[in-house]
């Protein structure tokens, strides 16, 4: 389905027509500045397919084998390519995604929590701005941690919200509003460390 691409820059309004229609009287200024946030997107390759995330929204999946005329679908609803199979606790609201180059985990920053149990197909829908979740290795749809997969999560200890993640050669730099963390792949049983 189609997703609104959003604004390409921050728009502020202070005069008549700032805010919702009919909010104030004709030719009167607004009491408070109204700002409309730009929409930020993150995306990364998962093999030949594409994972897409509009900030503070869900994760979408585009399957190359379906051709250029086929739109991306929500990862929790995808049924083709690497997204074909049993889905467990797929995040529903995320600030940014990336696929780690070293070990091919899909990582969701500023994510919602796990679903109610291991058979839940979606996360709980309540965004935690400091929660980092990662899928099982080489599997974009298995997010519920079990003894037989490598899915898991981490919570940042400082700051109040996740800002940005940047992947470097051997680590992922994770910025919050107050701190910078180094996230590294350390292998089983924890997978990642901060």
Each model region followed by its residue ranges:
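Recognizes the extracellular SEMA beta-propeller fold with strongest preference
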Residues: 1-194
């Amino acid at each position: 389905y189609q997703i609104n691409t959003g604004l390409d820059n921050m728009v502020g309004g202070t005069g008549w027509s700032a805010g919702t229609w009919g909010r104030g009287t004709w030719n009167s200024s607004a009491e408070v500045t109204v700002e409309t946030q730009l929409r930020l997107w993150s995306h990364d390759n998962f093999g030949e397919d594409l994972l897409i995330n509009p900030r503070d929204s869900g994760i979408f999946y585009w399957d190359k084998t379906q051709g250029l005329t086929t739109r991306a679908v929500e990862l929790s609803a995808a049924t083709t390519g690497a997204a074909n199979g049993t889905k467990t606790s797929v995040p529903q609201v995320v600030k940014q995604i990336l696929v780690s180059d070293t070990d091919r985990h899909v990582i969701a920053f500023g994510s919602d929590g796990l679903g109610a149990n291991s058979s839940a197909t979606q996360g709980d829908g309540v965004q935690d701005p400091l929660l980092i979740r990662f899928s099982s290795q080489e599997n974009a749809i298995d997010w519920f941690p079990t003894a037989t997969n490598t899915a898991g999560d981490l919570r940042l200890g400082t700051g109040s919200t996740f800002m940005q993640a940047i992947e470097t050669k051997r680590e992922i730099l994770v910025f919050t509003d107050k701190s910078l963390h180094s996230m590294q792949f350390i292998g089983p049983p924890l997978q990642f460390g901060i």
